[in-house]
Swiss-Prot record:
Its EC number is 2.4.1.182. InterPro entries: Glyco_trans_19. One of its GO terms (molecular function) is lipid-A-disaccharide synthase activity. SUPFAM superfamilies: UDP-Glycosyltransferase/glycogen phosphorylase. GO terms for biological process: lipid A biosynthetic process. This is Lipid-A-disaccharide synthase. It catalyses: a lipid X + a UDP-2-N,3-O-bis[(3R)-3-hydroxyacyl]-alpha-D-glucosamine = a lipid A disaccharide + UDP + H(+). One of its GO terms (cellular component) is membrane. Coiled coil: none annotated. It comes from Rickettsia akari (strain Hartford). Keywords: Glycosyltransferase, Lipid A biosynthesis, Lipid biosynthesis, Lipid metabolism, Transferase. Belongs to the LpxB family. Pathway: Bacterial outer membrane biogenesis; LPS lipid A biosynthesis.
Length: 391
């Protein structure tokens, strides 16, 4: 039996892992194990070592209360990989956790083949992660077409596979969606997306809700859809909404929510690309602990946080980061998008032009490309040997 050990630490990584498992599971004699979420568990006979929420953390100061528990989980994961006698380790994003696991294993199991999916954003930071990854991993799968040269020049085999949003089903029939969400003709719809990390949800809710309340003062026909990366997040959000006047609902069908909305208020992340692909204008807002912010400012070498803006070199999508993450600023810009169709249309068109330049259209899905590389270059010889021994 060929054993593949996956580690995914957040919702986006779980989606990627799940699709790769779906593409690999037709190969008899391959067993999947590791750490993942719902998508990976539903894709095959996969049971996670522990819930991914345990390692779904971000920031510098923010992770300090969890540092000892994270160390225990890293050690537990390393030992589980050793005990499983895995033939291949595939880590997906979550570099704060996955890199530390891989680094330990490179010393303990020098012959273990290791692949990392989602290249670290070395083009955005003043750091030496390309060299660090080259010392640990055998291969790196990049989601963006311009990323491989940053790694190949330091000796790491890096392949462009495409972005997972290529595998999403996007919706365009707003009339049908409005009926599905029971939205009246005269209602304006704002979609709010807070991400998958509980700490970030709690951090952003007060300013997001204040922004919505400002809009509601002049737009009492506003309906708000809070998207849920995890159904359990509804219990986190609800207490913040006890005294609000605006109408709201929750939805786990985030792509439908993005498509039905007239505008979106989004935390920075992969969700912004999905909102662009859904044809909805948005405002991006984000804040972290003050110490974390100043550390990031020392490391970062880019002006924007949203990928569309980074590629464009200009602020196509309005960003309100840290000290500018204020209800007065956010609400004014959102109202312009909700009620100024020219501004909204301009943002959507310009954003989608940038999206197309990322090479996000292909006849083959990223998970299929990734699975073929894994199968042909990392698993085929072992599978063939097992077949020969069984005959």
């Amino acid at each position: 039996m060929t054993k593949v050990y996956f580690i995914a630490g957040e919702t986006s990584g779980d989606f990627i892992g799940g699709r790769i498992i779906q593409n690999l599971k037709s190969n008899k004699g391959v067993e999947f194990t590791g750490i993942g979420g719902k998508c990976m568990e539903e894709a095959g006979n996969f049971k996670s070592l522990f819930p991914i929420t345990c390692i779904n953390l971000m920031g510098f100061v923010e992770i300090l209360p969890h540092i000892f528990n994270l160390k225990k989980l890293i050690d537990k994961t390393v030992q589980d990989i050793i005990n499983s006698q895995a033939d291949l380790l595939i880590t997906i994003d979550s570099p704060g956790f996955t890199y530390r696991v891989a680094k330990q294993l490179r010393k303990l199991l020098p012959k273990l083949k290791m692949i990392h999916i989602v290249a670290p954003s070395v083009w955005a930071y003043k750091d030496g992660r390309a060299v660090k990854y080259a010392k640990i991993y055998d291969c790196l799968f990049a989601l963006l077409p311009f990323e491989p040269p940053y790694f190949t020049k330091v000796g790491l085999d890096c392949r462009y596979i495409g972005h997972p949003i290529m595998e999403q089903e996007f919706y365009s029939d707003k009339i049908a969606l409005r009926e599905e969400f029971k939205i009246d003709k005269n209602e304006r719809v704002l979609c709010v997306t807070l991400g998958s990390r509980q700490g970030e949800i709690r951090k952003h809710l007060p300013v997001f809700i204040s922004s919505i309340e400002e809009i509601f003062k002049s737009c009492n026909n506003l309906k708000v859809i809070f998207t849920l990366a995890n159904p359990a997040h509804e219990a986190i959000i609800k207490p913040f909404l006890e005294d609000v006047q605006f109408h709201y609902l929750f939805s786990s069908a985030r792509l439908k929510a993005y498509a039905v909305a007239d505008a979106a208020l989004a935390k920075s992340g992969t969700n912004t690309l999905e909102i662009v692909a859904s044809g909805t204008p948005m405002v991006v807002a984000y804040q972290v602990n003050l110490i974390s912010f100043f550390i990031i400012r020392l490391l970062i070498k880019i002006k924007y946080v949203t990928l569309i803006n980074i590629i464009a070199g200009s602020e196509i999508i309005p960003e309100f980061i840290q000290f500018n993450c204020r209800a007065s600023l956010i609400s004014n810009t959102l109202q312009e998008l909700l009620f100024n169709s020219k501004k909204a249309y301009k943002q959507v068109i310009e954003s989608q032009k940038i999206l197309q330049t990322l090479g996000l259209k292909s006849n083959r899905s990223p998970s299929y490309i990734a699975a073929e590389i894994i199968k042909q270059e990392f698993l085929e010889s072992k599978i063939k040997l097992l077949k020969e021994n069984s005959t």
